[in-house]
Amino acid sequence: MLEERGIKPEKRAECSADLAVAANIPESYIASAEQRMYIYRRIALIRAEAEADDLIDELIDRFGDLPPSVNALIQVALLRGEAGRAGIRDISQKSGKLIFVLEDFDMEKISLLYAQPEYKGRLKVEAGSVPRVSLRLLPRSRPLDEARKFVLSFSLQRSE
């Protein structure tokens, strides 16, 4: 429909995320299984900060303060949306590192990230059937926060 009006739809990869983060809706927060499933579906649709903020406000109004695991679930959904817009297909955490699979592998953009002080000595390109970039986690770093920082840095490189 957008193409008929001469507007190109936003090209976005779907991103999956597998991080070592406690991200769920506990029964003690939302007792009804039906309501929990409905909220899980709503969270899965989050793609932007404003959508996350609106849902957080609604959840607080309906069920009270968010448990950390619900907040983490929303942050993972937001990460997936941001990463998809940045052209990242998959984010996983293994053996003290985050692994990012890119939709379009562009070594020039990766090189620009290598030059940033916070990534010096921590980024590595892994060749294989699916090229990927890994980011070594620092001790006591939070994987979700590190993933969001990388996605933001990567998306800024993509827009230049």
Regions found by a protein language model. Give the residues of each.
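Accessory helical-bundle/CTD segments and flexible terminal tails appended to RecA-like ATPase motors
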Residues: M1-E160
